[in-house]
Protein backbone atom coordinates (compact mmCIF):
# COMPACT_ATOMS: atom_id res chain seq x y z
CA UNK A 1 0.00 0.00 0.00
CA UNK A 2 1.38 3.38 -0.94
CA UNK A 3 1.32 5.98 1.79
CA UNK A 4 0.03 9.49 1.18
CA UNK A 5 1.81 12.62 2.26
CA UNK A 6 0.32 15.24 4.51
CA UNK A 7 -2.11 15.09 7.38
CA UNK A 8 -5.22 14.50 5.28
CA UNK A 9 -3.46 11.81 3.27
CA UNK A 10 -2.29 10.06 6.41
CA UNK A 11 -5.80 10.22 7.84
CA UNK A 12 -7.12 8.72 4.62
CA UNK A 13 -4.57 5.90 4.85
CA UNK A 14 -5.79 5.01 8.34
CA UNK A 15 -9.41 4.86 7.20
CA UNK A 16 -8.43 2.04 4.84
CA UNK A 17 -7.21 -0.15 7.68
CA UNK A 18 -9.52 -2.98 8.57
CA UNK A 19 -9.89 -2.15 12.25
CA UNK A 20 -12.70 -4.60 13.10
CA UNK A 21 -10.76 -7.69 11.97
CA UNK A 22 -7.67 -6.39 13.75
CA UNK A 23 -9.60 -5.90 16.98
CA UNK A 24 -11.23 -9.32 16.64
CA UNK A 25 -7.78 -10.84 16.10
CA UNK A 26 -6.58 -9.41 19.39
CA UNK A 27 -9.68 -10.68 21.22
CA UNK A 28 -9.31 -14.11 19.60
CA UNK A 29 -5.64 -14.51 20.50
CA UNK A 30 -6.08 -13.31 24.10
CA UNK A 31 -9.12 -15.56 24.60
CA UNK A 32 -7.22 -18.51 23.12
CA UNK A 33 -4.25 -17.89 25.38
CA UNK A 34 -6.57 -17.82 28.37
CA UNK A 35 -8.55 -20.91 27.35
CA UNK A 36 -5.46 -23.04 26.72
CA UNK A 37 -3.55 -21.87 29.78
CA UNK A 38 -1.18 -19.29 28.32
CA UNK A 39 -2.72 -16.67 30.62
CA UNK A 40 -3.38 -18.01 34.08
CA UNK A 41 -5.98 -15.79 35.74
CA UNK A 42 -8.10 -12.82 34.71
CA UNK A 43 -9.96 -11.04 37.50
CA UNK A 44 -12.13 -7.98 36.98
CA UNK A 45 -11.81 -5.96 40.16
CA UNK A 46 -14.56 -3.53 39.18
CA UNK A 47 -17.07 -6.40 39.37
CA UNK A 48 -16.33 -7.44 42.97
CA UNK A 49 -13.23 -9.39 41.92
CA UNK A 50 -15.08 -11.51 39.36
CA UNK A 51 -12.76 -14.09 37.81
CA UNK A 52 -13.26 -15.05 34.18
CA UNK A 53 -13.48 -18.75 33.32
CA UNK A 54 -12.45 -20.83 30.34
CA UNK A 55 -16.11 -20.78 29.28
CA UNK A 56 -15.86 -17.00 28.89
CA UNK A 57 -12.73 -17.46 26.79
CA UNK A 58 -14.42 -20.10 24.64
CA UNK A 59 -17.40 -17.79 24.06
CA UNK A 60 -15.14 -14.88 23.15
CA UNK A 61 -13.11 -17.08 20.78
CA UNK A 62 -16.13 -18.56 19.02
CA UNK A 63 -17.85 -15.17 18.82
CA UNK A 64 -14.78 -13.47 17.38
CA UNK A 65 -14.24 -16.38 14.96
CA UNK A 66 -17.83 -16.24 13.71
CA UNK A 67 -17.81 -12.45 13.31
CA UNK A 68 -14.47 -12.43 11.53
CA UNK A 69 -15.41 -15.27 9.20
CA UNK A 70 -18.75 -13.60 8.41
CA UNK A 71 -16.97 -10.34 7.57
CA UNK A 72 -14.26 -12.09 5.55
CA UNK A 73 -14.12 -11.34 1.85
CA UNK A 74 -13.84 -15.06 1.07
CA UNK A 75 -16.48 -16.43 3.44
CA UNK A 76 -17.95 -18.91 0.96
CA UNK A 77 -16.43 -22.37 1.30
CA UNK A 78 -16.08 -22.62 -2.49
CA UNK A 79 -13.28 -20.04 -2.28
CA UNK A 80 -11.09 -22.35 -0.17
CA UNK A 81 -9.00 -25.39 -0.98
CA UNK A 82 -9.79 -28.67 0.79
CA UNK A 83 -6.96 -28.41 3.34
CA UNK A 84 -8.10 -24.86 4.16
CA UNK A 85 -11.64 -26.10 4.75
CA UNK A 86 -10.28 -28.68 7.20
CA UNK A 87 -8.31 -25.98 9.04
CA UNK A 88 -11.32 -23.65 9.17
CA UNK A 89 -13.41 -26.41 10.74
CA UNK A 90 -10.58 -27.54 13.05
CA UNK A 91 -10.37 -24.19 14.84
CA UNK A 92 -13.89 -24.15 16.29
CA UNK A 93 -13.76 -27.94 16.78
CA UNK A 94 -10.69 -27.63 19.01
CA UNK A 95 -12.13 -24.63 20.89
CA UNK A 96 -15.51 -26.27 21.55
CA UNK A 97 -14.08 -29.77 22.00
CA UNK A 98 -11.65 -28.57 24.64
CA UNK A 99 -14.50 -27.03 26.61
CA UNK A 100 -17.22 -29.67 26.25
CA UNK A 101 -15.72 -33.05 25.24
CA UNK A 102 -13.66 -34.74 27.96
CA UNK A 103 -11.55 -36.96 25.64
CA UNK A 104 -10.49 -33.86 23.67
CA UNK A 105 -9.64 -32.07 26.91
CA UNK A 106 -7.62 -35.09 28.09
CA UNK A 107 -5.79 -35.29 24.76
CA UNK A 108 -4.82 -31.61 24.87
CA UNK A 109 -3.94 -31.55 28.59
CA UNK A 110 -0.80 -33.64 28.49
CA UNK A 111 1.86 -33.71 31.20
CA UNK A 112 3.78 -31.01 29.34
CA UNK A 113 2.67 -27.76 27.77
CA UNK A 114 2.90 -29.26 24.27
CA UNK A 115 -0.81 -30.11 24.01
CA UNK A 116 -2.20 -26.70 24.95
CA UNK A 117 0.43 -24.95 22.81
CA UNK A 118 -0.42 -27.17 19.82
CA UNK A 119 -4.15 -26.52 20.33
CA UNK A 120 -3.53 -22.78 20.49
CA UNK A 121 -1.41 -22.89 17.31
CA UNK A 122 -4.10 -24.89 15.47
CA UNK A 123 -6.74 -22.31 16.38
CA UNK A 124 -4.55 -19.37 15.36
CA UNK A 125 -3.68 -20.99 12.02
CA UNK A 126 -7.38 -21.73 11.47
CA UNK A 127 -8.10 -18.08 12.26
CA UNK A 128 -5.51 -16.93 9.72
CA UNK A 129 -7.01 -19.10 6.99
CA UNK A 130 -10.61 -18.17 7.82
CA UNK A 131 -10.14 -14.41 7.77
CA UNK A 132 -7.86 -14.06 4.77
Swiss-Prot record:
Give the membrane topology, semicolon-separated if more than one. Peripheral membrane protein
Keywords of this entry: Membrane, Virion
**Compartments in which it is found:** Virion membrane
- Which coarse location class applies to the principal site listed for this UniProt protein? virion
Membrane-spanning residues: none
| Signal peptide residue numbers | none
Of the GO CC terms on this record, one is: virion membrane
Q: What is this protein called?
A: Matrix protein
* Role, per record: Envelope protein that may play a role in host-cell attachment and viral genome entry.
Q: Does the keyword Ribosomal protein apply?
A: no
